[in-house]
Swiss-Prot record:
Side Periplasmic, residues: 25-117
Species this chain originates from: Stenotrophomonas maltophilia (strain K279a)
GO terms of biological process kind: FtsZ-dependent cytokinesis
Residue numbers on the Cytoplasmic membrane side: 1-6
Protein name, as recorded: Cell division protein FtsB
Taxonomic lineage: Bacteria, Pseudomonadati, Pseudomonadota, Gammaproteobacteria, Lysobacterales
Annotated signal peptide: none
Amino acid sequence: MRDWRWMLLVLALLLGWLQYRFWFGPGNSGEVMMLEAQVANQERDNEGLQQRNDALAAEVKDLKEGQSAIEERARSELGMIKPGEKFYRVVEDAPVHPAQPAAGVSAQVGDHPADVP
């Protein structure tokens, strides 16, 4: 009977020690959850960077193999045109704003000379 109590005490102490390490020791559950969140954030960042790399790789391939990408770049970034081609630039008019009264000037009824009878 005495051995049984001794064994129960050892098992309870072992369980207590394991629980302490699980909750407060190195690699505890809070730290594991924090690291899992960091891994998820890093995977999301990596996915975005992979998409950007794929787009850049496709652009490099297009520039190496096709003339249309080079022509498009020359037109849009350098403003180049083909010989004999006419270039038209459409400039939209700036919106007209109504004149605002000067600061400190009050525009009340009766202040204007036309308002006086």
